[in-house]
């Protein structure tokens, strides 16, 4: 196909605009208006003609060579994402073009780059390999997953849930969200689209797409389902083969046979003078909910609607599970978790991780059995239920860097294997080998659920460092600080909050271990939340509450793998919540609206920031460009859509607004999460009651929290009056904080200050601060140096503001109480607080009775390891080094 130089220049210029300003070292102005539309503009330009995708791929590969030569790390991830998009949407890539082979040779050299770049290109090479063997298979899998179309041996499903607060977002956001949730295409049209794409991407212009479209539309849903099932199975078989050339030939032969049997148009032998048609991806299945809670109970409604999709597969697994339980009951062995410590001690920790997370189920099974013959013989002696528990603990270990503790009494039985050998049989040995393969293959979630049934009253098992799996008697070692992704919390002292004079055992927090190769579940739920830092705080508390519920009784996580997406929205231009909850206007409402416009502070101006989204943008520049940048555009621009073609097809779908397209782009291509540290505060009230709350961004104490409560009252705040810190009544506070030094050590300080406000916020707000401990907090104290009495009735304070980076804080009111506000949330303002303790949030472990018993049995162990609780937010590249 021939293209003018003008078209190539336009595509190259659009590509350059997408990459402009992404380098952190580039000296440029802070003006970034409209840059978020560059990626959307490139996609809209390329989609006008099918040949433009090939031009874009060539330009991307040429740019990738330049990036490799210059070692420009900032452009690697955007180029990889753009290449994935171009190949995914390409209607047809001729085999003789060798574009994919050229891309494979270029991207193969990136495997020597550091993490996470090498991981990204490893996945990209797998994507290229699948496209060489089965063209368009990634497109097919994505559409099947988003539309909930099950195919044999590939029954995954993805649903998108949009959570919006009517008092937080504008009405245009609500209309766009409702439009996304109401544009689900019918299954008949989806099957027609998938078959058209499958034949066009495989045969190119040899397939008469117009005739194929009319014949497919005339068929019934049952006929289309049967045709597509056969075609999809042939494509999956081709992707599983090893020879790309042979796989394509067999796939083309199978598709010709299917077309002949279904009376579809005959495939021509040579290319015909036809025009390829770009086929867009249908809108994903979406649900929209109005959400303003500190829990995710609204997601249970999605579970009830989607249970018909996921339940059949779960029932088949449960049947296999019951058969395995019957075998376990006949063995008469007790569930002893530590019985595998000795046989597995010869296998290194890293080899187990790599086998389970990278090589897949079969390779992990082989690596375990190839460790040693003695290990195999000892494995056959162990109870089956112990093995299932061990596999379950390994999966947990992959997610958080921890393995589950177990009962120490099982070590006694481990030292006497002769008592168990007498009970073993040849059938038991053969059956156990098969169970190991099945367990490593797909059923970690079912095993975890069965363990929870057996241990209902024990709570969640405590977490211990993964090294103790292999060496339970090894001396604890403080892990050395290493260079890693900035979003992962660094190591630091984690002892419980106390006075500096009280001695305490050393306690070390452990950063979570991210694993992208988790055992595939039946379905994935994308949870997309819109809002400011106030809403991010609600997400943090809801996530903490969800983890606590799911650890005792799995419901959502039993069927869904949860992915969280965060779209920042400015709150400063919004009206009070009471005005938006009642749509029909009345004369009094109009007066309130006019008052809100005249008094911006009453409408929530500057009442909430977007620091969390800016922090994510520092970690992932592509997120900052394409998601955070949308916040700077006016709504009339975001509500526009691309103009339809001059000659639209007969069944062309309605064009979505720019905001809807970018939301779908974010959900489809952002697959790598960053971890945001959660913090907890233990509050003590005047009556002695205690409460523990979670926050993610900020905690305001004293006058700043009281002022926010007054502003939240709406127009009534004018009667109450809002004074600044100079007019505020000071508080005498005893403040103990752990100050962080450059070396990473912490030093406790105990002071008594007279303050009006004490605020804590996430410390990392600049690129330079990413290299330090990202879980630290900025302690800002507004101290009253001198109180001056004027001739009037009011007194004025002479203030001094100081800021300190801290790990933990303890604040006690001296004969006074104060107010506390979490994450700038007016619904989280707590009054009459006398004591406040703030620290990083850990995963719950103290509720386990086994942990309490072990702590009393082994007091000589001076150190403990805790796993930090972090909120995973999906981004395009994850946290870049």
Curated annotation (Swiss-Prot):
Pfam families documented for this protein: PI3K_1B_p101
GO CC annotations on file: cytoplasm; nucleus; phosphatidylinositol 3-kinase complex; phosphatidylinositol 3-kinase complex, class IB; plasma membrane
Keyword Nucleus among UniProt keywords: yes
Topological category with respect to the lipid bilayer: Peripheral membrane protein
InterPro entries, A to Z: PIK3R5/6 (IPR019522)
Keyword Metal-binding: no
GO molecular function: 1-phosphatidylinositol-3-kinase regulator activity
Acidic residues: compositionally biased ranges: 316-330
Activity regulation: Greatly activated by G gamma proteins.
Cellular compartments annotated: Nucleus; Cytoplasm; Cell membrane
GO biological-process terms attached to the record: G protein-coupled receptor signaling pathway; positive regulation of phosphatidylinositol 3-kinase/protein kinase B signal transduction
Name of this protein: Phosphoinositide 3-kinase regulatory subunit 5
Species name: Gallus gallus (Chicken)
Source organism phylogeny: Eukaryota, Metazoa, Chordata, Craniata, Vertebrata
């Amino acid at each position: 196909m021939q293209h003018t130089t003008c078209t190539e220049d336009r595509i190259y210029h659009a590509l350059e605009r997408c990459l402009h300003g992404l380098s952190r070292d580039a000296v440029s102005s802070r003006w970034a208006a409209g840059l978020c539309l560059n990626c959307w503009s490139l996609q809209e330009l390329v989609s006008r003609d099918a040949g433009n995708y090939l031009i874009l791929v060539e330009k991307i590969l040429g740019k990738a060579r330049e990036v490799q030569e210059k070692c420009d790390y900032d452009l690697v991830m955007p180029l990889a994402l753009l290449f994935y998009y171009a190949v995914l949407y390409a209607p047809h890539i001729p085999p003789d073009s060798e574009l994919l082979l050229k891309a494979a040779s270029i991207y193969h050299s990136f495997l020597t780059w550091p993490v996470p770049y090498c991981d990204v290109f490893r996945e990209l090479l797998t994507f290229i390999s699948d496209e060489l063997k089965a063209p368009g298979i990634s497109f097919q899998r994505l559409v099947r997953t988003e539309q909930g179309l099950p195919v044999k041996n590939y029954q995954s499903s993805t649903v998108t849930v949009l959570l919006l607060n009517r008092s937080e977002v504008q009405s245009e956001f609500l209309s766009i969200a409702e439009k996304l949730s109401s544009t689900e295409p019918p299954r008949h049209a989806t099957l027609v689209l998938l078959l058209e794409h499958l034949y066009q991407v495989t045969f190119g212009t040899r397939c008469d797409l117009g005739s194929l479209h009319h014949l497919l539309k005339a068929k019934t849903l049952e006929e289309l389902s049967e045709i597509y099932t056969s075609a999809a199975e042939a494509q999956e078989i081709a992707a599983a083969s090893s020879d790309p050339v042979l796989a394509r030939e067999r796939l083309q032969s199978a598709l010709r046979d299917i077309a002949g049997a279904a009376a579809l148009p005959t495939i021509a032998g040579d290319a015909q003078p036809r025009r390829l048609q770009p086929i867009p991806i249908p809108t994903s299945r979406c649900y929209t909910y109005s959400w303003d809670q500190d829990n995710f109970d609204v997601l249970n409604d999605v579970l009830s609607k989607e249970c018909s999709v996921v339940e059949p597969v779960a029932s088949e697994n449960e049947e296999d599970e019951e058969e395995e339980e019957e075998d376990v009951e006949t063995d008469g062995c007790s569930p002893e978790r530590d019985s595998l410590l000795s046989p597995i001690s010869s296998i290194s920790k890293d080899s187990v991780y790599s086998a389970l997370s990278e090589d897949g189920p079969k390779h992990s099974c082989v690596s375990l059995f190839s460790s040693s013959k003695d290990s195999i013989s000892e494995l056959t002696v162990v109870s089956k239920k112990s093995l299932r528990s061990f596999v379950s603990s390994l999966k947990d270990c992959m997610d958080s860097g921890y393995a589950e503790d177990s009962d120490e009494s099982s070590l006694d039985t481990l030292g006497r294997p002769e008592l168990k050998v007498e009970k073993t049989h040849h059938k038991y040995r053969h059956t156990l080998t098969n169970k190991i393969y099945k367990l490593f293959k797909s059923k970690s979630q079912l095993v975890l659920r069965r363990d929870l049934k057996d241990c209902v009253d024990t709570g969640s098992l405590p977490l211990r460092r993964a090294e103790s799996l292999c060496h339970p008697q090894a001396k604890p070692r403080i892990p050395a600080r290493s260079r890693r992704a900035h979003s992962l919390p660094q190591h630091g002292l984690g002892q419980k909050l106390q006075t500096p004079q009280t001695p305490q055992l050393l306690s070390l927090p452990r950063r979570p271990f991210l694993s992208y190769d988790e055992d595939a579940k039946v379905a994935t739920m994308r949870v997309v939340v819109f809002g400011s830092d106030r809403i991010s705080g609600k997400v943090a508390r809801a996530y903490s509450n969800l983890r606590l519920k799911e650890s005792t009784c799995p419901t959502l996580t039993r069927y869904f793998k949860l992915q969280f997406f965060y779209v920042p929205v400015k709150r400063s231009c919004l009206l009070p919540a009471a005005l938006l909850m009642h749509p029909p206007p009345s004369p009094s409402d109009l007066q309130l609206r006019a008052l809100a416009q005249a008094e911006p502070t009453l409408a929530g101006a500057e009442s909430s920031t977007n620091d969390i989204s800016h922090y994510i943008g520092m970690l992932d520049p592509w997120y900052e460009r394409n998601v955070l940048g949308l916040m700077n555009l006016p709504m009339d621009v975001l509500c526009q859509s691309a103009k339809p073609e001059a000659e639209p097809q007969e069944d062309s779908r309605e064009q979505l607004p720019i905001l809807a397209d970018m939301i779908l782009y974010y959900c489809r291509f952002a697959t790598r999460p960053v971890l945001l540290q959660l913090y907890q505060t233990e509050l003590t009230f005047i009556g002695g009651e205690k409460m523990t709350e979670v926050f993610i961004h900020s905690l305001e104490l004293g006058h700043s929290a009281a002022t926010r409560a007054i502003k939240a009252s709406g127009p009534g705040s004018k009667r109450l009056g809002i004074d600044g810190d100079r007019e505020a009544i000071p508080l005498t506070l005893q403040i103990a904080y752990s100050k962080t030094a450059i070396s990473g050590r912490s030093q406790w300080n105990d002071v008594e200050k007279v303050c009006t406000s004490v605020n804590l916020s996430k410390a990392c707000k600049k690129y330079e601060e990413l290299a330090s401990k990202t879980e630290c907090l900025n302690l800002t104290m507004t101290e009253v140096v001198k109180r001056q009495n004027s001739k009037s009735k009011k007194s004025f304070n002479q203030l001094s503001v100081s800021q300190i980076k801290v790990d933990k804080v303890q604040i006690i009111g001296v004969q006074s109480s104060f107010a506390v506000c979490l994450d700038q949330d007016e619904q989280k303002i707590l009054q009459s607080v006398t004591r406040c303790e703030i620290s990083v949030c850990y995963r719950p472990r103290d509720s386990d009775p086994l942990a309490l018993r072990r702590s009393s049995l082994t007091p000589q162990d001076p150190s403990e390891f805790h796993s930090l609780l972090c909120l995973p937010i999906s981004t395009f590249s994850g946290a870049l080094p």
